[in-house]
Amino acid sequence: MSIAQLFNQSWVEKSKYVPVRLSDEERKILSLLEAALEVIDYTGHVDIISYTTRTKLMVKYLNEMCSIVMGLVTAMDIKAGRDLLIGRDHKSNARFFQTVFEIGRRYKIMNPEKMRATYGAVMYMCQDSLIPDVRSQLGFDFVSPIKTVYNVLEKHKLLGLLEEKQLLNNLLKQSDPQSNANAKAELLKEREEASETLLKKYNPGKDEKLQKVLTDCFASLADHEAFLLANRNPVEKMRAYLHKFFNPHDTKNGSLKIGYMTGAKLNHDHKTQFFYVDQSLVFWSCMMDQMFLLWLESDASLLDKHSRYFISDTGQGLNRVQLCPLVRSTVTRILSSVQKQQEIPWMGSSVIHLGDRDVPNALMFIDKYRQVPHILAPLVKVLQQLEFLRDPYLVQYIENEYGSVNGLQKTILLDFFRHGFNGQGSDGGSCIDGRLTSAWNWTNEITKKKYYRILLMSGFLNFEGI
């Protein structure tokens, strides 16, 4: 599959990995789950090196989690709590608990910046509930399939809607943040007309429940497109800056050369480093485009009944190490597509660390690539804002120090492209995940940069995605 095919999948294919937006009732359940997760430190109790069986610990704390959730439900809605307590045991409420955890998993996929401290516990609880001995003692597990747009439309026999390519394109087209008011108004009009046409065609009887199903699916697909705009565009813009300010065959605008003498783990001349950075950015862009698919596959890998994990000290504390062939297959396919599109040979290693000490499991993998927009979006935003500075004193300071705003932009980019891609991220140096770790390590050094104060005055906050 080519890069163009990756970026231009049909709505039928996209809908298979786009989760459905949470309803108001589901958001209430989510708040209960998050509250319960704040009370119990599951991994702290269970993920330990022990000479005794961990099964008893798992069963104990999974039962405790169920009890906490039921208690919170009763406190919020006594009638709903009473209905749950009628069954007396947790097994009789298995479907409810599966729904609670599915809502948490689905919400995280659609909102990667949320549940940072608790999502791991959600996945590990679900993972442990699938262990045969644990499931046997509990009487059930916490896992149910993620609700996607495709599943919902299939259930209501509305899959034909996904073939309405032109109408869906008009409905889900995203506005450019730089576009003017007239363009935004025109886009809004197109969306309204497309929505009205689709609703008339697929809900001619104006059934309220069906109307809600359709509007929820539209909103969920729109969320996916908005995610692409917010997460893939910064990568594309950073790549555009690379080509604007630097030439692989000329160093007059600054040399990207790195070597062991400068603290790098790689030894690249200017041309090699240019293409090393460029290829890395192309790969990241493709990864962002397929992020929802990767989230679902990471979820499936972690909850694979046939793939057991083991606890190991990976050098970053105790972690669950688990093979994830499903995710590896997709990443390999994306990498292969990128490599085939390159005019020159692939620079650096093609090793993908998954299920080893560098990237122990699918959860660690997906969390790692979640950082891409956190690194690039703030940088791109500042680089753009520098072009529209209105403070004459700040502009004067920049001109005195760097010659011009353009000179400052080039300084920042030169620093990032050299030291953010210097191979310090992993033992492999230039391996696929090591490139991203190198960039993240560079962000940790940002406060030591000479230009850091100017970044702050230009609107920069942090690289935390907040």
UniProtKB/Swiss-Prot annotation:
One GO cellular component this record assigns the protein to is: cytosol
**Superkingdom of the source?**
Eukaryota
Cite the Pfam families for this sequence: DUF2009 (PF09418)
Q: Which UniProt keywords apply?
A: Cytoplasm, Nucleus
Principal localisation = cytoplasm
Q: Which InterPro entries match?
A: DUF2009 (IPR018553)
Subcellular location(s) of the protein: Cytoplasm; Nucleus
Question: Could you tell me which PANTHER family the record lists for this protein?
Answer: UPF0652 PROTEIN C16A11.03C (PTHR31560:SF3), UPF0652 PROTEIN C16A11.03C-RELATED (PTHR31560)
The UniProt family comment states: Belongs to the UPF0652 family.
Listed name of the protein: UPF0652 protein C16A11.03c
